[in-house]
Amino acid sequence: MTDAVTAHEMQQYDQYTINEIGVPSLVLMERAALAGIEVLGAGQFDLSQVLVIAGLGNNGGDGVALARLLMQKGVHVDLLFVGDENRAAHNNAIQLEIAKKYGLTPVNKVKDFRQYTVIVDALFGIGLSKPVPIKLGEMIKRVNAANVPVVAIDVPSGINATTGDIMGSSIRATATVTFAYPKTGLLQGEGVKRSGSIFVKDIGIYSPAELHQFNPEIKEN
């Protein structure tokens, strides 16, 4: 397994890929969504009734894209968008508009999470740096109590991607689809207990050192 990275390192590699290499951030978001679908569709999960929980950030944008792509494949999927759509990150807002144009209308609440056969967690990603708000923590507890398989996108929501600490409340995932490199927080502390099976997926983000192996003209740092 490739060496694990901290949240800060991953954010640097992400920005390097976008700003220096020139891969558009929306392309990375689509690839992340496709990677999630690859894990969901590998046979371990029942896709007859899927719920995707998406937050306001780019992790939520991954979730919105994933929900739309599932719908396009004929999967019955509900998209629970948590928060004010007007406050969504730029690329997340774009994904929302695309989803709506394809006919996927988000919902803003779910009465009973037990009605779903699998839940995709795209509420918080590696950028979480403060405790989960109490109201969202209560929702996370309801998801955990539903005893439905959960696939987390990048990290289980509420887990610090660097330390593995629980930031107030956290999802208990059956599986975690993480991108480019394992995150240190998935391999220590509560992160180990909350991540389930970890799938590391290549979506086109690399460290400068790794890119140097492809192209020696690229500086290693």
UniProtKB/Swiss-Prot annotation:
It catalyses: (6R)-NADHX = (6S)-NADHX; (6R)-NADPHX = (6S)-NADPHX. Keywords: Isomerase, Metal-binding, NAD, NADP, Nucleotide-binding, Potassium. GO terms for biological process: deadenylation-independent decapping of nuclear-transcribed mRNA; P-body assembly. Residues 10-211 form the YjeF N-terminal domain. K(+) binds at N59, D121, S157. It is an enzyme of class 5 (isomerase). InterPro entries: YjeF_N_dom, YjeF_N_dom_sf. The keyword Metal-binding applies. PROSITE patterns: YJEF_N. Binds 1 potassium ion per subunit. (6S)-NADPHX binds at N58, N59, G60, G61, D62, G125, I126, G127, L128, S129, K130, P131, D154. Its EC number is 5.1.99.6. GO terms for cellular component: P-body. It comes from the Bacteria. It holds the Pfam family YjeF_N. GO terms for molecular function: metal ion binding; mRNA binding; NAD(P)HX epimerase activity; nucleotide binding. Belongs to the NnrE/AIBP family. Catalyzes the epimerization of the S- and R-forms of NAD(P)HX, a damaged form of NAD(P)H that is a result of enzymatic or heat-dependent hydration. This is a prerequisite for the S-specific NAD(P)H-hydrate dehydratase to allow the repair of both epimers of NAD(P)HX. NCBIfam families: yjeF_nterm. This is NAD(P)H-hydrate epimerase. The lineage of its organism: Bacteria, Bacillati, Bacillota, Bacilli, Lactobacillales.
